[in-house]
Amino acid sequence: MSKSWDVIVIGGGHAGCEAAAASARAGARTLLLTHKLETIGEMSCNPAIGGLGKGHLVREIDALDGVMGRMADKAGIQFRMLNRSKGPAVRGPRSQIDRRLYREAMQAELFSTGNLDIIAAAAEDLIVEDGKVAGAVDAAGQAYRAPRVILTTGTFLKGVIHRGEDRIPAGRVGDQPAIGLSDRLYGLGFQMGRLKTGTPARLDGKTIAWDRLESQAADDTPVPFSYLNHRIDVPQIACGVTYTTEETHRIIAERIGESLVYSGRATGVGPRYCPSIEDKVVRFADKTSHQIFLEPEGLDDDTVYPNGISTSVSEETQLLFLRTIPGLEQVEVIRYGYAIEYDYVDPRELYPTLETKRLPGLYLAGQINGTTGYEEAGAQGLVAGLNAALAVQGREPAIFARDEAYIGVMIDDLVTRGVTEPYRMFTSRAEFRLTLRADNADQRLSDRGISLGVVGPVRAAAWTEKKARLDAARAFARSVTLTPNEAVKAGFKVNSDGVRRDVFAMLAYPDVTLDDLGRIWPEVFTWNTDVREQIEIEAAYAGYLDRQRADAESLRKDEDLRLPADLDYAEIGSLSNEVRGKLARVRPLTLGQAARIEGVTPGALTALLAHVRRGRAA
């Protein structure tokens, strides 16, 4: 006997949590199917949320009423704004997270979400009927039916843990891998590959000589992730900082053959920007030390995560090299590090909605798409969950543009270019990063989220009130002006050019502050911190933002030129076989997306455009 839903989400990690929550918020009857209820929201690797680029994604998830930012605010134990001394566009909110608090907060959130059922069962297969997905089957043969299914399997697809000579089939330590789902995807003809990632040993904090370490404190005034929160009530802690030594490197170099990559046993590619300590020793042989952050995993947990030394060497070697590190001479290990290899699906198999092209109704989100990181997974989960719900309701899909959100940048990169290594978000990936700031994600996305039906009433009311305050402040800032003579009399150095200057123009002068202007226009002092920050940023970036808006408008013209879904590229005779093959593989939805496919030349785009226009004229 089977029960039916509108949407089934398989997997309770970060992508699955956001997918289930978004689908339910958008009005779809949703089932979250996960192998263990107690591991929903588990932070399998590092105990942190946010960072450069990643913090932007968390803010965008939050602006669309997702859950990650609010849960991180409930569990954050060391908030820091990265790149604080640099411009607002590249600042990134980050926090160490208490694993238990985060997991408990996420579970409480999901268990209290309307439209959402949660069942503990290991999905083993998909139900496919008439060329479409129709549900899933668990290991016991129980069927769960839905016209939309979202796979958020993380590292579980044929996952294998490597530690020295040990090879252990697992999705993560203590959990069985998902074999049947992987076999089904291969059987359906999906283009798939292997990737790998790694994690360091977990250390017993009671055996660390903390007094010998450098200390990294939290910010004095923590900045929350969620726009709904204005303060952090969780106690804040410091992290320790230490360094590897030449002796550390000697031990690792002597035993490099134990490492997955250097043993020749690796079948998957690892993340370039999160290399193992073995990789660091080999690739940066001239360096005599590497920095390690010792990050407590919780307020009442002695477990410490040594960020910077993920490894796959044997337990014996791990303990040997750990005890050559200052402060860790007497350290005891709670759990040893390991590498894990797993299957992923080439994300060029997906539409920008994250629905698969090969099997209608099936959506993929998270590491199954070749990404790495909680934040990247959560953002994809939200998009997949939202689009699955919209599809069930017969509504237009939600596709986020590159000039609209980092979410749009990431998904466009994935579905257009694919991946050759685990994909991580950086601010440098965005062409419009002055516009796509962490501080204005709600301004970019909350109205759209409301229209899509994925933003609930509490956030909608909070955003509407904030938007009214911002609009009033901007209107006031443009309505009041100073002549050059008035400005000089007030103590400001401006050109005597006869031009009247409003608040924005005055703030463009580096030595003029809002407090200075408040002495002339007291209204300024009534603005709260959020409003003041936005006015200052918009004034500082005014000229640059205008240019980026023009560039974005130019991009939109290409994005607005839709390509037929059934376009036969073989009919375009002037295309090379290579370009024709790439276009057929990706099947871009717009001319803009076609232009971003590697190897597609301007000449090919011209031929493509001419062919489409001829077809429309016929």
UniProtKB/Swiss-Prot annotation:
NAD(+) binds at residues 270-284. Pfam families: GIDA, GIDA_C_1st, SAM_GIDA_C. One of its GO terms (biological process) is tRNA wobble uridine modification. GO terms for cellular component: cytosol. GO terms for molecular function: flavin adenine dinucleotide binding. SUPFAM superfamilies: FAD/NAD(P)-binding domain (SSF51905). Homodimer. Heterotetramer of two MnmE and two MnmG subunits. NAD-binding protein involved in the addition of a carboxymethylaminomethyl (cmnm) group at the wobble position (U34) of certain tRNAs, forming tRNA-cmnm(5)s(2)U34. Belongs to the MnmG family. This is tRNA uridine 5-carboxymethylaminomethyl modification enzyme MnmG. It comes from Caulobacter vibrioides (strain NA1000 / CB15N) (Caulobacter crescentus). The gene is mnmG.
